[in-house]
Amino acid sequence: MTIKNNILVIGSGSREHAITWKLLESNQVDKVILVPGNASSSTMERVITVECSKIDAESISNICKEHNVEYVFVGPEVPLVDGIVDGLKRKGISCFGPTKKAAQLEGSKVFCKDFMARNNIPSARYQTFTDYNKAKQYIESLNYKIVLKASGCAAGKGVLIPNNKEEELEGLKRIMVDKEFGSAGDEIVIEEFLDGEECSLMCFSDGYSLVVMPPAQDHKRIFDGDKGANTGGMGAYAPAPFIVDCNNNATTDKSKSKSSFGTIIDRCVETILKPTINGMRKEGKPFVGVLFAGLMVSSSSSTTNDKVINVLEFNCRMGDPETQVVLPLLETDLFEIVLACIEGRLDGLDVKWSNKFAVTVVAASKGYPDSYPKGLKINGLLENKNTNDNIIFQAGTTVNGSNDIVTNGGRVLSCTSVSESLEDAIKNSYKLIETISFEGMQYRKDIGQKALNHLERKKQQQANSKQSVSYSESGVDIERGDAVVDNIGPLAKATTRLGCVSDLGGFGALFDTKAAGFRDPILVSGTDGVGTKLKIAQELGIHDSIGIDLVAMCVNDVVVQGAEPLFFLDYFATGRIHVDVATQVVSGIARGCKESGCALIGGETAEMPGMYKDGEYDLAGFSVGAVERDQMLPSNIQEGNILLGLASSGVHSNGYSLVRYLIETKSGGLTYNSIAPFDSSKTLGQVLLTPTKLYVLSCLAAIKSGGVNGLAHITGGGITENLPRVIPDGLDCEVELGSWEILPIFKYLVELGNMETEELLKTFNSGIGMILIVSPDKVDSITKSLESNNEKVYKIGKIINSKTSKQSKSKVIYK
């Protein structure tokens, strides 16, 4: 007769629901006591939820006595780091989880990094600091990208990945000075940023031996495409095919792998997991429980043996949501594994895993990972009957006074499906999550997509290796390229002007300046791109206006020299030509050319599947203009000249790396499809994709009227850095703050980034896209000319003599 045991599980998330669900499959388990638990007990038999305001050894031991519990399984890290295992052992209760000393692997990132260094476990180079000023000096001395880690427990959110030196120093301040993560930031780890694919690798351990679990991949960011703020995890899948030697059916050749998961995992066991378990034991901290290794697998090579694997972090417990995809693949009795670890006999157990795939998608509350509402009724949950292949694990749930299951946390549910193929597991997970709903429910739509892409590439590589190769099979489709040329031919022809003497599609474009009316011309060229504004256009699928930006960035530079843009050439590079997308982009280029009076006379469309992903493209433009030799600008700029600012249409095409960072990490969960907080008639994406203003025709008319001594195109660097570029040495620019309208989008960005005015003025155009330096007696006539060409004109300042010397470089002085 099998002895039935009661086991207590500490925790209240989907991880603990999954652990409880798996333990109940054991014929050795009678009841599971879930503390403090969630509403999952209302949908499972033999589960008792016990509320507990303080999770410590004293409280848990009292619950164990009341419910005749001999074994405790600790889910989250905080009780482990606080030493609950030690306390329960002293009271005679067996516990699955590491002691306080062993839990330092997660509780102190400083201890963890030093331990890895002592035991030759591969990890990024690093330094640790308790002194803010010394840490600041160290960061300022570095010339490579870094990661900032609060040393203590910070609920999985104490890691910052800055993009530049400014963000690095700001992140350091947030952790050590502002105490964003509390006492966890008293000590900090500064380590080198590693690039590649992240992987979660867990193992059971009895302190001597270990059993590795299927590797999983988590999705940390809140939004699709790994955008937005970090979360506890929005979904996961296992096994991860980029690190497991398997195809779409998850089958590996077990005769060639000790771990059953392929040679890469075998190497991880030998170089990471075993040295960790052995090292902890030798240092007097034997690790019993689940060791979680967060790995970075380099993408530097496509061959298995050349992959570089480093440890990002260790955790002292099972991951969430990784547990929800790993345990459904476990075929061995989980309770038996727990006993074997506690009793030091894990090496005598033959642990088996399914050859299937598991995928989980997390349903989260509106506003998560920031503030979110609670108490919202969850529809469809009770109608779902959990099976071995489709399971809804509960996290932030509770039962209200009406006996309804309602939301009670940020991450609410994990919808898990198991299938023979990864593709089917993904489809079934999304079918499952679509059967439930609550107000404001959000979830990612791309869980597992990177793995599917990997499998598709692998499949294609295998197919290509078996057959002869054509150019189209390499990913380059000449027919699609020809179709684009056919579509854009009429668009380009519509921009033809005097001087054009060649048609689109030749080896070179020809232009006759004499036919265009020039006597003694100087040619002026300008080249530019659109930058990361393209990322927003590609994400939203809005491609018909980005070409205007490309033209504007080039021709606005050309007109600064007093030149008339004559012709334009574009370069369009993409991973795969989509005829409709390319046509829309070029239509925008043609429109920009037409509005600037220049001809689109040539270009290049390049399909490069090895350089860009499908759906990605980049743009570059090249414009040539001409100005009569005796009419070049700048000319005759002197003290007393007036600065006339022309209003911008928006952000234009500079500063979008910062814009995207602010929207995706600081906006409280807003997306580019969200209604703009400052303009209810438009989405944020529509505001940000407003095309760069074309100033050519209005400025040429003003120049022709006389009195324009110079122009400055306000691009990256703002007024602060662009205006002095056209001013002679010995002169400064006095600019009056408040003399023009700062557009709402800039006020919003300033608010998100807590930016100073000085930073705004040297980063964005701030509402002024072009500045004309004008003779005082011509201000009125030039203003009228500009306004007649639909420009909004501001008198923003004047030219003054430098107060230092006649040789000093020009600068902007704000009043």
UniProtKB/Swiss-Prot annotation:
Q: Where does ATP bind?
A: 139-200
Q: One of this protein's GO BP terms?
A: purine nucleotide biosynthetic process
Reading the lineage from the top rank, the first entry is: Eukaryota
SMART domains recorded for this chain?
GARS_A (SM01209), GARS_C (SM01210)
Q: What is written in the cofactor note of this entry? A: Binds no magnesium or manganese ion per subunit.
Q: Which PROSITE patterns match?
A: ATP_GRASP (PS50975)
Tell me the keywords, alphabetical order.
ATP-binding, Cytoplasm, Ligase, Magnesium, Manganese, Metal-binding, Multifunctional enzyme, Nucleotide-binding, Purine biosynthesis
Record-linked InterPro entries: ATP-grasp, ATP_grasp_subdomain_1, PreATP-grasp_dom_sf, PRibGlycinamid_synth_ATP-grasp, PRibGlycinamide_synth, PRibGlycinamide_synth_C-dom, PRibGlycinamide_synth_C_sf, PRibGlycinamide_synth_N
Q: Where does Mg(2+) bind?
A: 313, 315
Q: What range does the record give for the signal peptide?
A: none
Q: Name one GO molecular function term.
A: phosphoribosylformylglycinamidine cyclo-ligase activity
Q: What class of enzyme is it?
A: ligase
The answer on whether this UniProt entry bears the keyword Endoplasmic reticulum reads: no
Q: Which GO terms describe its cellular component?
A: cytosol
Domain (ATP-grasp): residue spans on this chain:
113-343
The record's section on Pfam families has:
AIRS, AIRS_C, GARS_A, GARS_C, GARS_N
* Record region (GARS): 6-452
Q: Which cofactors, by name?
A: Mg(2+); Mn(2+)
**Which pathway does this polypeptide act in?**
Purine metabolism; IMP biosynthesis via de novo pathway; 5-amino-1-(5-phospho-D-ribosyl)imidazole from N(2)-formyl-N(1)-(5-phospho-D-ribosyl)glycinamide: step 2/2; Purine metabolism; IMP biosynthesis via de novo pathway; N(1)-(5-phospho-D-ribosyl)glycinamide from 5-phospho-alpha-D-ribose 1-diphosphate: step 2/2
* Annotated catalysed reactions: 5-phospho-beta-D-ribosylamine + glycine + ATP = N(1)-(5-phospho-beta-D-ribosyl)glycinamide + ADP + phosphate + H(+); 2-formamido-N(1)-(5-O-phospho-beta-D-ribosyl)acetamidine + ATP = 5-amino-1-(5-phospho-beta-D-ribosyl)imidazole + ADP + phosphate + H(+)
Role according to the record = Catalyzes the second and fifth step in the 'de novo' purine biosynthesis pathway; contains phosphoribosylamine--glycine ligase (GARS) and phosphoribosylformylglycinamidine cyclo-ligase (AIRS) activities.
Give the family from UniProt.
In the N-terminal section; belongs to the GARS family. In the C-terminal section; belongs to the AIR synthase family.
The protein depicted here goes by the name: Bifunctional purine biosynthetic protein purD
Give me the gene this protein comes from: purD
